[in-house]
């Protein structure tokens, strides 16, 4: 497996970043609200051996598949989203915030029986103290499935690629997954998947799948490390009938398994890692925008995605990377 982190010129990078602008991508999957409560710890509670966080700031951001949308928008793309939200305050918040940042929201379907997923993280001194989740994970009705099916059909018109962002909250199920596979094949559209372990038996016939190292290990049945990496890539390709695989490995960078070429390694480009929240969303967004272009290799797409990941993990919270930040990261490393 060769190391490949120098095979992209600045001129080529900037041409790819420019070409991302205006590209249309359909995002299907699980949306949520990422809430952050930030503060400082100055004492331990007298009631229990736990830190007392003095709250200084609160913020809420679109998360999950909605964070994929934020990443696409940050690069000048034109995303549409298809997902379920609850008929609640957080569902309305998601709809409003996505519309305000420029995402088409006609594909957001409201479910009266569902609580919109909310992940709340308490952060002090750049360390996560605790996270608590509020959500409902239930099968949805035939009526809602029909609404989602219609939203997918509308959303596929005129797009350049499709991202399935599966966070295991119930939206990605067999019938809708198969519909997307059938329609993307028929329309010759690029299909990328960010997988979730619980749904591994659903997945098949994907252009690109992007598991992290833990997810890759569960897909292939053995731990993924330097010695087993090559075998893991082959196994995942076979299991999901995927044309290509990119395994994200945190501080160890990425491993790229193209359709018929030698696997490649990319070292991480992060100077410091403050927060990995949403980094996988950044990776699949950039990979889809670039790998779906004519004449672009998976190696080139992965180099750009690796630069973008290096930008976002150096920020706190659910972050995105702009074209200018990716270009600056490249120049800093040159």
Please place each PLM-identified region on the residue numbering.
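Positively charged, low-complexity intrinsically disordered leader regions
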Residues: 1-42, 330
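Substrate-binding N-lobe of the ribokinase-like
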Residues: 6-14, 46, 50-116, 329-331
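Structural motif
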Residues: 26-28, 131, 160-163, 192, ...
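Active-site metal-binding loops of divalent metal-dependent hydrolases
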Residues: 31, 167, 282
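Conserved phosphate-binding/catalytic loop of the ribokinase/pfkB sugar-kinase fold
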Residues: 108-114, 121-156
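Short acidic, glycine-rich surface-loop motifs adjacent to enzyme active sites
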Residues: 158-171
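Conserved phosphate/ATP/ADP-binding segment of small-molecule kinases
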Residues: 169-263
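Conserved post-catalytic alpha-helical subdomain immediately downstream of the catalytic base
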Residues: 243, 269-332
């Amino acid at each position: 497996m060769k190391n490949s982190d120098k095979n992209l010129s600045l001129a080529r990078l900037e041409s790819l970043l420019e070409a991302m602008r205006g590209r249309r991508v359909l995002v299907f999957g699980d949306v949520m609200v990422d809430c952050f409560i930030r503060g400082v710890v100055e004492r331990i509670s007298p009631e229990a051996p736990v830190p007392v966080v003095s709250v200084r700031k609160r913020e809420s951001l679109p998360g999950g598949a909605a964070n994929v949308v934020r990443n696409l928008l940050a690069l000048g793309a034109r995303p549409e989203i298809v997902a379920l939200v609850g008929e609640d305050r957080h569902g309305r918040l998601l709809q409003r915030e996505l519309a305000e940042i420029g995402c088409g929201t006609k594909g957001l379907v409201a479910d009266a029986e569902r609580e919109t997923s909310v992940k709340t993280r308490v952060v002090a001194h750049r360390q996560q103290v605790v996270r608590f989740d509020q959500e409902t994970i239930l099968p949805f009705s035939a009526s809602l499935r029909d609404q989602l099916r219609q939203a997918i059909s509308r959303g596929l018109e005129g797009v350049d690629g499709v991202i399935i962002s599966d966070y295991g909250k119930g939206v990605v199920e067999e019938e809708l997954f198969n519909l997307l596979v059938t329609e993307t094949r028929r329309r010759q559209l690029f299909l990328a998947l960010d997988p979730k372990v619980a749904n591994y038996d659903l997945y098949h016939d994907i252009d690109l799948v992007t598991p992290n190292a833990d997810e890759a290990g569960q897909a292939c049945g053995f731990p993924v490390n330097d010695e087993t990496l090559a075998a893991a890539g082959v196994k995942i390709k076979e299991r999901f009938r995927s044309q290509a695989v990119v395994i994200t490995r945190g501080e160890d960078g990425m491993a790229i398994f193209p359709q018929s070429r030698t696997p490649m390694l990319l070292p991480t480009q992060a100077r410091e890692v403050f927060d990995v929240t949403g980094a996988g969303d950044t990776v699949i967004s950039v990979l889809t925008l670039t790998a779906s272009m004519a004449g672009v290799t998976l190696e080139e797409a992965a180099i750009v995605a690796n630069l973008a990941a290096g930008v976002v993990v150096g920020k706190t919270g659910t972050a995105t990377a702009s074209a200018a930040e990716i270009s600056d990261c490249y120049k800093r490393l040159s």
